[in-house]
């Protein structure tokens, strides 16, 4: 792993921890050149999963794209990186259990929304606004109203 400070590739692993769900490993590393300490996260690379978009196009599944979307929804919310990582892994595990090699994008969006709803309602509405392509404020109001009804 390349040191983010001096770019040396010589380092040693100081500590390794497996995540609660068991699908990622966090490693604490120390650069042997400059002594800088940094963390890395390792996860299983899932090959061959194709997402079927709404318009029928197909593209390779990108964990990073999903992570970026969830991070954007959770920006400046009381949701930590570990919660986001667990959400992503949970969604991916669920999708792999229900689908073989092709996953409809709607299934991904629905799975994320279901988990965000119970995690953080503001993040849920943010994600829903992009996923459902809200065009005006009335659509936000409808989603917020529906969210309030589901809570009761």
Curated annotation (Swiss-Prot):
Zinc finger (unnamed) boundaries: 3-34
Cofactor mode of binding and number, as noted: Binds 1 zinc ion.
Domain ATP-cone: 49-139
Single GO term (MF): zinc ion binding
Keywords from the named record: ATP-binding, DNA-binding, Metal-binding, Nucleotide-binding, Repressor, Transcription, Transcription regulation, Zinc, Zinc-finger
One Pfam family matching this protein: Zn_ribbon_NrdR
Cofactor(s) recorded in Swiss-Prot or TrEMBL: Zn(2+)
Example of a GO biological process term: negative regulation of DNA-templated transcription
Job description of the protein: Negatively regulates transcription of bacterial ribonucleotide reductase nrd genes and operons by binding to NrdR-boxes.
Family according to the record: Belongs to the NrdR family.
NCBIfam families recorded: transcriptional regulator NrdR
Protein name: Transcriptional repressor NrdR
């Amino acid at each position: 792993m390349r040191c983010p400070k001096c770019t040396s590739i010589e380092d040693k692993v100081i500590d390794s921890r497996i995540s609660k769900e068991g699908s990622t490993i966090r490693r604490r590393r120390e650069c042997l050149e400059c002594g800088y300490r940094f963390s890395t996260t390792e996860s299983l690379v899932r090959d061959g999963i194709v997402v079927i978009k709404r318009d029928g196009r197909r593209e390779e599944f990108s964990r990073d794209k999903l992570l970026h979307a969830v991070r954007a929804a959770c920006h400046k919310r009381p949701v930590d990186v570990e919660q986001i990582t667990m959400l992503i892994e949970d969604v991916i595990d669920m999708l792999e259990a229900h689908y073989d090699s092709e996953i409809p994008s709607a299934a991904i969006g629905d799975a994320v929304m279901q988990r965000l709803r119970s995690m953080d309602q503001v993040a849920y509405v943010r994600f829903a606004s992009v996923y459902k392509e809200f065009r005006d404020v009335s659509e936000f109001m409808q989603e917020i109203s529906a969210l309030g009804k589901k809570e009761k």
